[in-house]
Swiss-Prot record:
NCBIfam families: PRK00504.1 (NF001764), PRK00595.1 (NF001860), rpmG_bact (TIGR01023). It comes from the Eukaryota. One of its GO terms (biological process) is translation. The lineage of its organism: Eukaryota, Viridiplantae, Streptophyta, Embryophyta, Tracheophyta. Keywords: Chloroplast, Plastid, Ribonucleoprotein, Ribosomal protein. This is Large ribosomal subunit protein bL33c.
Length: 66
């Protein structure tokens, strides 16, 4: 049986390069991925290297609030 709250929670990962660059110029978009993380194993913010189709390279995608 499960104890307490759900251990797995859905999180959104957003490209950090697109967010920084969109302030200075008009960007075509911001890359976002939806994934799940285990709250017990990773209590802090999740950061993964993923491919950004707007930057055309692999960049760090950080967890954002919903």
């Amino acid at each position: 049986m499960a104890k307490g709250k759900d251990v797995r929670v859905t999180v959104i990962l957003e490209c950090t390069d697109c967010v920084r660059n969109s302030v200075n110029k008009v960007s075509t978009g911001i890359s976002r991925y939806i994934t799940q993380k285990n709250r017990h194993n990773t209590p802090n913010r999740l950061e993964l290297k993923k491919f950004c189709p707007y930057c055309y390279k692999h960049t760090v995608h950080g967890e954002i609030k919903k």
